[in-house]
Amino acid sequence: MRVSYVCIDPGVPVFGAKGASVHVQEVVRALRRAGHEVVVHATRRGDLVPADLADLEVVEAPVRATDPARREREQAGISRRIAHDILAGGTDLVYERYSLFSTALAAVTRSCPARGVLEVNAPLIDEQREHRVLVNERAALHALCAQAGCARLTVCVSDPVRRWVERLAPGARALTVPNGVSLERIVPFPEDPSGVVVAFVGTLKPWHGVEDLMRAAALARAPWSVRVIGEGPQMPALRALADGLGLDVDFRGAVPPEEVPAHLAGAAVGVAPYPDLGGADEQYFSPLKVLEYLAAGLPVVASAVGQLPRTLQGVGVLVPPGDPARLAEAIDALAADPDERARLGALGRRRAEERHGWERVVATVLDRVRQDEGVEP
């Protein structure tokens, strides 16, 4: 099957280091491993190209406008040009990562027999309005309704995201399918024998709660150290906080996705200290980092928010969000108990293998399309 993968979000380079880029690459890998021919159409290619995707055809159409209103119009125009290119080249399936103002999937599926899958990872209209600049909200809503209305399936990474889609686009055929993890790229490894290392992987933004991890480390009663794998706008503040607390934190900075396993090597615990963002529907994420910890055979300590209690049931340790003292207690307990770390790590790896491999995630999506249409995708 010929698959046209579309990502018109200029904040998501195909070959980038952030979690969204990892998501794009892993879905493409899973499609290719299933025997499908994939062509990617995107507004940003990126330059961190992994060896196994070096032959991937990526058609880039950059967004150049900086003025918010012009930028929105340009994104809409690019989506129309991409749809034209896809129709000219032919396709069997359009798999589009939901982006503001794009109507590419709708345009293609209205004009040819190709099926469409819309993947929604976040309530982008709300995010753009609250955290950035949204000039033409009506156009953004119209585009979402067109896309979800034409998609054979709208895949949502969490129940709150699915509810958001169903509220704004009532005709959407929506299904919750959480994120996955590469079971080949990320595998278990031995702990560093010189000490317990607690690892965080992710972009350094306020809603990831890394400052609570720093404060927990300052409260620790057992010996353990912190390793932060990632970059972001909070890096200067986190470095200053670590210095002020007298912590020797191992900041690794941004790393390409294929190098994350090497930076996790030697860690003994993985942590996801999310704060309380104000209600269940605000905790709409499906965190890749937690699945990577599970695949790496790390015991996980995470805030009891969003999907994490379900994901970590029986295989992880949950703590109240925004509580460095409770976070420190949980990490202290694991730091002092290597047998419990080994037990939880083995259970976590098994959970990742049974439920969360990317091949399983993509197969779930394609199977649902086939069931709805009675056609083998």
Place the predicted regions along the sequence by residue.
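Conserved donor-binding/catalytic core segment of Leloir-type glycosyltransferases
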Residues: S4-V6, V155, P190-R221, R227
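Conserved acidic donor-binding segment of nucleotide-sugar-dependent glycosyltransferases
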Residues: V201, G314-A325, A333-D339
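A short, well-ordered alpha-helix in the C-terminal region of glycosyltransferases
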Residues: A333, E340-E354
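Membrane-proximal helix-turn-helix segments that form the acceptor-binding/catalytic region
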Residues: H84, A107, L124, V135-T154
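Nucleotide-activated donor-binding/catalytic signature segment of Leloir-type glycosyltransferases, i.e.
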Residues: P236-L264, V269
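N-terminal subdomain of nucleotide-sugar transferases
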Residues: M1-L48, D52-A54, L153, R215-A218
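Acidic donor-binding loop of glycosyltransferase active sites
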Residues: R152, L264-Q283, L298
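Carbohydrate-associated surface elements
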Residues: P160, G180
